[in-house]
Amino acid sequence: GRDGYIAQPENXVYXX
């Protein structure tokens, strides 16, 4: 979610 689209469930949502 650091970039707002990276496919990683870091914050429960991709970015979102």
Curated annotation (Swiss-Prot):
Q: Which UniProt keywords apply?
A: Ion channel impairing toxin, Neurotoxin, Secreted, Toxin, Voltage-gated sodium channel impairing toxin
According to its record, what are the GO cellular component terms?
extracellular region
UniProt GO molecular function: sodium channel regulator activity; toxin activity
Its tissue distribution reads:
Expressed by the venom gland.
Taxonomically, the superkingdom here is Eukaryota
Does Secreted count among this protein's keywords? yes
Cite the domain annotation text.
Answer: Has the structural arrangement of an alpha-helix connected to antiparallel beta-sheets by disulfide bonds (CS-alpha/beta).
- State the protein's purpose: Alpha toxins bind voltage-independently at site-3 of sodium channels (Nav) and inhibit the inactivation of the activated channels, thereby blocking neuronal transmission.
What does the sequence similarity comment in the record state about its family?
Belongs to the long (4 C-C) scorpion toxin superfamily. Sodium channel inhibitor family. Alpha subfamily.
What protein name does the entry list? Alpha-toxin
